[in-house]
């Protein structure tokens, strides 16, 4: 343990902001007068470099101006925080997890963000809301590139508060360019809104009190890479590890601390775990970060999947023999919430070949879900109760299995899903 403490201490990078003295803000220099002026910007996607897909601009939901407030209930029109500053929402790009982002899509959103920020100047602060696991063609640190380019527009004195997913990646450049930085403390991310509010609360608090940039930041890269399926904070060891973060922020001289698991499904130098802390007391900040990093390293071999892992045949046998219903089987090899294509048909093809599901007296199974635009269009045309015969899946990733043909009866048609837009349920076999 003593040897590991030495290693982690050597890895700790103290990033000094103002070298312990409060830096001059735009308000100090007379550039800004009146209420606090805080901009909002950010691009967020979790994108796997191992997926054959690419995410274009059409894959993003881009909001601008006052429409952005809808994503932040703590900034609603009647919220206390809304009255504490003039909020200037610029551009917010969001996409469901997917493949690497095209350079054209990234540049289009970035350039528009920069223009909108320039028009919003002068500023006291920026709420920088990102995921942290965006991959872009030709870049190995997109979020670091984005914040560096933003700095070229807003300058070094504007206070930047960054909010991230705990499965994001924190490069040294992103850590340096962010004055305040925080992440979710729960997986599943039940505290997403709470974490974003913490980012804005810390930002407003420092601006209102005239504290400026924190004097010290500690950034510790931890050489661990874990998949999300092993990092639920509802079970150990992540439960106890993340339970330590909150108390760390109550220490004198520590404003906030965070642990990033990192993102396993992109082949980039920044993909690893990170621990950070920041505040105005150098010793307290360093100690908080090192204690969290040491705990993380100590339990690194204890992370495990949240459920037993096995082959499809074994899982199906267990499901059919189980008295507990429904029995849920997760195909985590094609996880669309982590950047997988979500249309690999291998598992569905295996299920369609099993005779027990053809028997009218046999078991039933719900497969959720597989993309199939042609099937959806046909289902809408024939309506509920109609017969469909169309292919689905393997439009993005056909490396393991081709598209499957589904012949069956339309059981339901649902409109309005935020990602899929239209969903249909087709009964096949028994």
Where are the model-predicted features located?
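Sec-dependent signal peptide recognition
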Residues: 2-10
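C-terminal motif of bacterial Sec signal peptides marking the signal peptidase cleavage site
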Residues: 16-18
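Bacterial signal peptide processing site
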Residues: 20-22
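N-terminal amphipathic/basic leader segments beginning at the initiator methionine
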Residues: 30-82
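Glycine-rich phosphate/diphosphate-binding loops that line cofactor/substrate pockets in enzymes
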Residues: 31-34, 82, 115-124, 315-327
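Hard-cation-handling environments
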Residues: 36, 226-430
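Active-site histidine-anchored catalytic micro-motif
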Residues: 39, 43-46, 50-52, 103-110, ...
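Internal, active-site/partner-interface "lid" segment
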Residues: 207-238
């Amino acid at each position: 343990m003593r040897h590991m403490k030495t290693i982690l201490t050597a890895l700790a990078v103290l990033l000094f902001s103002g070298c312990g003295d409060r830096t001059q803000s735009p308000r100090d220099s007379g550039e800004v007068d009146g209420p606090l002026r805080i901009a909002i910007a950010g691009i967020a996607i979790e994108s796997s470099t191992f997926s054959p897909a690419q995410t274009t601009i059409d894959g993003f939901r881009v909001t601008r101006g006052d429409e952005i407030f809808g994503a932040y209930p703590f900034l609603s029109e009647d919220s206390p925080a809304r009255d504490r500053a003039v909020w200037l929402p610029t551009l917010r790009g969001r996409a469901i997890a997917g493949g690497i982002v095209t350079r054209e899509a990234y540049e289009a959103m970035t350039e528009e963000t920069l223009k909108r920020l320039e028009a919003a100047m002068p500023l006291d602060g920026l709420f920088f809301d990102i995921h942290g696991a965006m991959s872009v063609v030709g870049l190995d640190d997109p979020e670091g590139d984005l914040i560096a380019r933003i700095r070229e527009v807003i300058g070094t004195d504007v206070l930047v508060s960054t909010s991230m997913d705990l499965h994001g990646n924190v490069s040294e450049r992103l850590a340096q360019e962010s004055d305040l930085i925080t992440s979710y403390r729960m997986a599943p991310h039940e505290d997403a809104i709470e974490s974003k509010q913490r980012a804005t609360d810390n930002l407003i608090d420092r601006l209102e009190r005239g504290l400026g940039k924190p004097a010290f930041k500690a950034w510790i890269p931890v050489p661990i890479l874990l998949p999300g399926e092993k990092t639920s904070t509802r079970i150990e060891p992540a439960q106890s590890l993340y339970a330590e973060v909150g108390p760390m922020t109550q220490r004198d001289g520590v404003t906030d601390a965070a642990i990033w698991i990192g993102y396993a499904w992109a082949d980039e130098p920044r993909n690893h775990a990170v621990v950070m802390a920041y505040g105005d007391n150098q010793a307290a900040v360093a100690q908080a970060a090192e204690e969290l990093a040491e705990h993380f390293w100590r339990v690194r071999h204890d992370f495990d999947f949240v459920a037993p892992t096995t082959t499809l045949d074994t899982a199906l046998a267990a499901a059919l023999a189980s008295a507990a219903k429904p029995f849920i089987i997760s195909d985590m090899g094609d996880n669309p919430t982590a950047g997988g294509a979500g249309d690999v048909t291998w598992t569905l093809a295996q299920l369609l070949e099993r005779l027990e599901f053809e028997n009218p007296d046999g078991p039933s199974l719900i497969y959720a879900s597989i993309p199939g635009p042609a099937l959806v269009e046909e289902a809408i045309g024939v309506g509920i109760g109609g017969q469909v015969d169309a292919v689905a899946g393997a439009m993005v990733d056909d490396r393991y299995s081709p598209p499957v043909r589904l012949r069956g009866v339309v059981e339901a048609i649902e409109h309005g899903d935020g990602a899929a837009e239209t969903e249909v349920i087709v009964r096949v076999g028994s």
